[in-house]
Amino acid sequence: MKILLSALLLLVTFPAVVGTAAATVASAPHPAPAIRLFSWVPADGFPDRFPYGQCTWWAAYNRHVTWNGNAADWLANASAQGFHTQPTPSVGAVAVYRPGGGYSALYGHVAVVIAVGRGTYTVSEMNFIGWGQVSTRTVRWPDPHIEGFIPVREEDIP
């Protein structure tokens, strides 16, 4: 009841704040089920040991990830486990971004490539626009902030 009254008070005094406050309260205690990006992703996503809400969680949910580490370390860690890495985007690849340049200066960022066009690629990502929020964006190619890509392996597609 107290929350309802507070929300009503916010609605009357600051209508622009209500949507943000409600979204934060609703998503914090119990994360909503995620939507698979590709038909070959298991119904509940791939097993995932990364913290919910982070970019690494979303990428690992939609890709078979066997390595650990912060986003900035994913390219090297995947390569060390024998995964192929490449300098160009492909559908299903994990895009690994360098720290800084609009991404976390300490941890870097990862996203999943969902489309590749002429001079662009489109990614699905979590925690780019806010904690726990999934968004898509189209990026111009070549991208100076990209470290590289981890493409899908045939054996990772059931």
Predicted regions and their residues:
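Secreted/periplasmic proteins that engage bacterial cell-wall peptidoglycan
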Residues: P29-I129
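Intrinsically disordered, low-complexity
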Residues: M1-V65, P87, T120, Q133-P158
